[in-house]
């Protein structure tokens, strides 16, 4: 199944494509776990008695005498979860034997961020709209606690992420600059969410909150009218213009595509819980790594695609900030040209588009590890 066919329907993508990929996977089966953080304090001043972070790992952790490890921390996108990355398009290009992140050589960490997947969030805690208003900073801090306090990782070989996870990657480089050998943010920009990107997110949130069926977050069933409207907006933002015109060149084809997408949502509406989505999209409100980019101390390769409506290359933001605000020589900005292989923002899931850049980054940052005696 082509990834873009279900675009925003990440749960549907996981239900169908993930099941097929697992049946033919060559990478090791992941080991799941849960880390419970007591009395987690959010930047909003709110606290949660117990914050559960669900995670999966592949491979075995190896720690050298100098504290360096073979750990690779990879972060998913908004309204997704770690399973998003266990597909043939992603894991099948990275984690198999002999590939760049061979799971027999690396300890790969895939967590569900706060409010996503099986980690604590508005829906699965029963708190609904009373769940603490988390921001990206909270998510990164919780990840750091997961790695250091639970998994025993105090230094990683690589921190990388896609979309929201890409934004978190910039933050990791600033908040914990000595924690990794290399950074690779994908499908993101190191600048606050403003302009067009903020407007569509705010429209998405306000559309749901203005629906009487939302009932201030205490609905008994998903408010379908606003849910479908919001997901339609996300559909438009997620796809590439060239791809949409190429594959749906007539009015009827475009309408049918939208109808099929809506059917995927209506078949499993709880997979798109609107409280979870409101929180997830609002979590970017305080994101703004630009002022502290000079804090990044390790090589970084940022990759976007030319047909990404969420991170439009014509703004020139990525190249300018990497060149002007980062320590000279540490950053590299890459924009993958539009092609039949790209499909807008969601192109990040197709690791074949950027795996060569990852290989180059890892080669650049090889640091001899001191073996334990």
Name each model-derived stretch.
Residues 161-165, 169:
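Gly/Ala-rich beta-loop-alpha elbow adjacent to hydrolase catalytic centers
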